[in-house]
């Protein structure tokens, strides 16, 4: 590979990475308006099955927000999360979060249940729910 080709490939890579991060969605964890704020560590504990006082809600496995949420919150990818929940379910130590079709369904379920928590796009937040944490 000559220098000119390498320089072009490097430029394409930089542009691709820059555009990829520029379009990242803002994700927030939400709860019932009466809920107290949670730290990211507390949220991770709920979504990893370590805290059963709250009821975590998931979006569909095929939804891009789901993979993004778990990666940002726990550092784990979708396959790792799925395997972890399969293990917890098999051993009787937990039950995977209930899947809902989209952010509106999550928001509606969270608004109706004081123990439920979920995640949605920041732009979808309204007065029916409370932002518990920003997921960066």
Which ranges hold each PLM region?
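Sec/Tat signal peptide C-region and signal peptidase I cleavage site
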Residues: 18-24
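Low-complexity intrinsically disordered segments
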Residues: 2, 15-18
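Bacterial N-terminal signal peptides that target proteins for export
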Residues: 1-11
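Cleavable N-terminal signal peptides
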Residues: 10-13, 22
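Flexible loop/hinge segments at secondary-structure junctions
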Residues: 24-136
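Generic early N-terminus positional signal peaking at residue ~5-7
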Residues: 5-7, 19, 29
């Amino acid at each position: 590979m000559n220098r000119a080709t390498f320089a072009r490939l490097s430029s394409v890579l930089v542009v691709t990475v820059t555009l990829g991060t520029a379009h990242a969605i803002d994700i927030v964890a939400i709860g019932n308006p009466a809920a107290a704020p949670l730290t990211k560590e507390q949220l991770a504990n709920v979504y990893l099955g370590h805290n059963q006082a709250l009821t975590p809600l998931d979006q569909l496995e095929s939804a891009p927000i789901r993979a993004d949420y778990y990666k940002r919150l726990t550092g784990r990818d979708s396959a790792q999360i799925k395997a972890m929940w399969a293990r917890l379910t098999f051993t009787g130590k937990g039950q995977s979060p209930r899947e809902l079709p989209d952010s509106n369904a999550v928001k509606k379920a969270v608004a109706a249940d004081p123990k439920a928590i979920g995640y949605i796009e920041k732009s979808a937040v309204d007065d029916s729910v409370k932002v518990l944490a920003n997921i960066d």
